[in-house]
Structures are given as C-alpha cells and as structure tokens.
Swiss-Prot record:
Keywords: Cell membrane, Membrane, Necrosis, Transmembrane, Transmembrane beta strand. The gene is het-Q1. One of its GO terms (cellular component) is plasma membrane. The record marks L237, F238 as: Cleavage. This is Gasdermin-like protein het-Q1. It comes from Podospora anserina (strain S / ATCC MYA-4624 / DSM 980 / FGSC 10383). GO terms for biological process: programmed cell death. The lineage of its organism: Eukaryota, Fungi, Dikarya, Ascomycota, Pezizomycotina. GO terms for molecular function: wide pore channel activity. Belongs to the gasdermin family.
Length: 278
C-alpha cells in the first residue's frame, strides 16, 4: 500500500495518553503498534508483528516528559493528580414516587521512581513497511476514511499508583394527598437518603508503562494514500489540553460521558501535554 505522509519533526507540543491501568514494559504499549481505537491498547492490529524501527527515527524524550510529570504532580490542580466526575439524575417511577441518584468517581494517579520516555518519527519509508501488514490492509480497506492510530511514544516509570473512590448517593421520596378535617387537603412527604462509598487502590512497581503518544493517520481508498493528521487530541479524562472540559466556579472540571444506570464508569484514559524539543 503506497503512502503519502506529511513530514513532521520531533519538535512541538506532544499529547501523552495515560491509561487507567499501567502495564509491564513492552506488553501492551509498543512503538509502531497500529490501533483502531486510540483509547484501547488491545485494539492493536499488529501487536505481534511490528516491524523494527530504524535507530535514526528514535529519540529519547525522557527529559521533557520527566519535567512535565514532576511539574504536574507538584501543582494542587495537577492534571495527573485528580479527576472527579459526577452524574445526577431524577427518575420518575410512577405513583407519586420519585428517586434520585448521585454517583461519581474520584481518582488519583501518582508516579514516582525513574521516568523514561522514547518517541519515534513515523516517516514515509516506515509507514510503507508498517502498512504492508495484512491486518492493517484489511482494516484500512474495510471502510471509507477509517482512521488508524500509531503508537509513536512510550513512557515508563519505576512506580505507578492509581487510587479510585466510588460513591453513590440514593434518595427516595414518597408523597401523597391525605384528608385533613377542617383545613381540607394537604400534602405529606417522606424522604430517605442512603450513601455508599467504596475505595479501590492499584499499585505497580518494578517498571511500568504508564503513558503513550498516538499519531492519527487517515487512509483514502480512492487515492490509495495515507495522510498524517498529527497527534491524536480527542476525548480526554483530565484537563490540560483540548477535549471535553468545562469551567465551573473557576475550576476546570472533566466532562464524562457514557454513564449507564446503576454504574459509575470512568473513561479509559487521561492525558497530559509535553513541549517537545527539536
């Protein structure tokens, strides 16, 4: 499959994606892995058949990534330190009975120990080799303009700790009209509230891949070419860059979607920005 890719340099702003669960080095996050979903590392089309990357395309990104992580974790509103989604809804159950549920998850990510990072430049020659994979070819030709996401950066830390606290508050109110002598009809009500809270903590030591950088490519079936669309900057979990975030009371609050009734669901990934050097 011939390709035409825009030539991009190492310099510029980089978006690093942080998955909820870290993995052992080289298991899920691999340079050159082609993903169909940038938030799902298991969607790789070529995880076990990635072609070797020429040394001249590799670059050590440790200094800037390490500095970015240290800077973020030192701030009280760190994009890596917290995320607090919440979902509130009122359900009308009928018969004058109403119930409301407030549910959410607060999470924290702590990174310590030695931080290392490597990035590579997926130039035209490498993409030509990468796109010869039969699974990649099949996926690219399956649909019109389907995007592909290539892992072009991996960051590893000596110790990673993820802590999640889930909380659900339920309220139920029952109201009805009753007869009251002389005064006439009135209303009485009863409200009950119950709160449930659980905490889950996951730790990993001995070297873990905790972040990856993804570059998006679009394949044109008509022209038979692949276009480099730059770093993927889609949906994010943490504030700090482009993505579904809103300001509330002077604080940037993450926006979470795809909640299901009776379930609190966190997005699979977060992100942070790094200013790369040439």
């Amino acid at each position: 499959m011939p390709t035409k890719t825009s030539q991009h340099a190492f310099a510029g702003s980089e978006r690093w994606v942080v998955p909820r669960y870290s993995s052992k080095p080289g298991t899920l996050i691999r340079l050159g892995s082609v993903l169909t979903d940038p938030e799902d590392l298991e969607s790789s089309l070529n995880l076990d058949s990635i072609p070797p990357i020429p040394p001249h395309l590799l670059r050590d990104a440790t200094p800037e990534v390490r500095m970015s992580v240290q800077t973020e974790l030192s701030k009280s509103d760190s994009t890596l330190a917290k995320a607090a989604p919440a979902l509130e809804g009122i359900l009308t159950l009928g018969g004058g009975v109403e119930a409301s549920r407030s549910q959410g998850v607060s999470s924290s990510l702590n990174i310590s120990g030695t931080v290392k990072a490597t990035v590579f430049r997926a130039d035209k020659s490498y993409m030509d080799v990468l796109l010869k994979d039969k699974n990649v070819i099949s996926y690219a030709k399956r649909g019109l303009g389907k995007p592909m996401f290539v892992v072009v950066g991996v960051a590893t830390a000596g110790r990673v700790e993820m802590k999640e606290t889930r909380h659900v508050t339920r309220k139920a109110g029952v109201s009805g009209k009753v007869g009251v002598e002389v005064i006439g009809e009135g209303e009485v009500g009863l409200e009950r509230e119950r709160s449930d809270k659980s905490c889950n903590e996951v730790r990993g030591e001995g070297g873990l891949d905790f972040a990856y950088r993804v570059r998006e490519f679009g394949y044109s079936r008509v022209r038979g070419t692949v276009k480099d669309k730059g770093d993927w900057t889609g949906k994010v979990l943490f504030a700090g860059g482009k993505g579904p975030v809103v300001e509330k009371g002077g604080e940037v609050v993450p926006v979470f979607k795809e909640f299901k009734e009776g379930e609190v669901k966190l997005r699979a990934t977060g992100s942070f920005d790094v200013a790369a050097k040439a």
